[in-house]
């Protein structure tokens, strides 16, 4: 028989929605939650997200568990019979698995409450513009604010049954980068009468990499990636505007500040050198995921005792996750859950092995019961 929560994952996989547009997803989750035993449950909506409090039998604290619920603007290429029914959107980062795991854990505790309160946070907009910080600042979250909080993320590179975690920094600080260049367009035959923004933007791409090689401590780490460049509209017209879209990733907030300071200093020089206007446009900023050492070591000990073949020491990664905002104020941790897929996160053919779902549910139930 197909595991109930694998079936739920497949249903959620078909209705992927991007940040703050998760209306069908929210409705699906609310419908499922409404059918659970309600004696110990309280439910609140927050925008397109949901908070569910499971009242404990003799509570002295509140333990939080967070799952993200949004998808990516990617056209799915898996060929699965339960592929996305929303053209251009896909659960290409595993949030469908995250949700089904959270529902599995919630289902257990709705019928068998723990000693302490449990808060389940179904958070929208992790992929952007970032839902963690605003939901943390909400009155709904403040009323049930947990004393600790946990989360997971699927990892295609690990096998099913493996859990990778480490104390301290797990995910990097990330910042979206949107830059526009405005100069003077003109005829391709008369470049001396124009200010070519394709040239200006192209040169800026190369020069910004010297920030990494010459302004960042070699023992530290940072990366600037430009994933999209656009300039001009036709081949025989000098471009009046050009645009660069990318990301910055660093292992500390201080290094992120250095990168931003140098980028803005470079931009001022570019305006003089290329006779143009350079403007930075706001994007999402995600704080590093910094696992609490005591909480993490406790979880590692739990794994070694209860699931001795599962624990894998993790390495810090340059990936970003807005769960870091929770951990900046509340003790807890995030871990990687192995799903053994040949395709990476954010790939149109990502197809995680679903056996990871019942495994993760079992681990989390036993861990939370041990708290």
UniProtKB/Swiss-Prot annotation:
Ranges in a coiled coil: none
Metabolic or biological pathway: Amino-acid biosynthesis; L-lysine biosynthesis via DAP pathway; LL-2,6-diaminopimelate from (S)-tetrahydrodipicolinate (acetylase route): step 3/3
Top EC class for this record: hydrolase
SUPFAM superfamilies reported in the protein's UniProt record: Bacterial exopeptidase dimerisation domain, Zn-dependent exopeptidases
Glycoprotein is among the record's keywords: no
Any GO molecular function: N-acetyldiaminopimelate deacetylase activity
Keyword set includes Signal: no
Active site: 68, 127
EC number: 3.5.1.47
Annotated Pfam families: M20_dimer (PF07687), Peptidase_M20 (PF01546)
Biological role: Catalyzes the conversion of N-acetyl-diaminopimelate to diaminopimelate and acetate.
Protein name as catalogued: N-acetyldiaminopimelate deacetylase
Organism expressing this protein natively: Listeria monocytogenes serotype 4a (strain HCC23)
Organism phylogeny: Bacteria, Bacillati, Bacillota, Bacilli, Bacillales
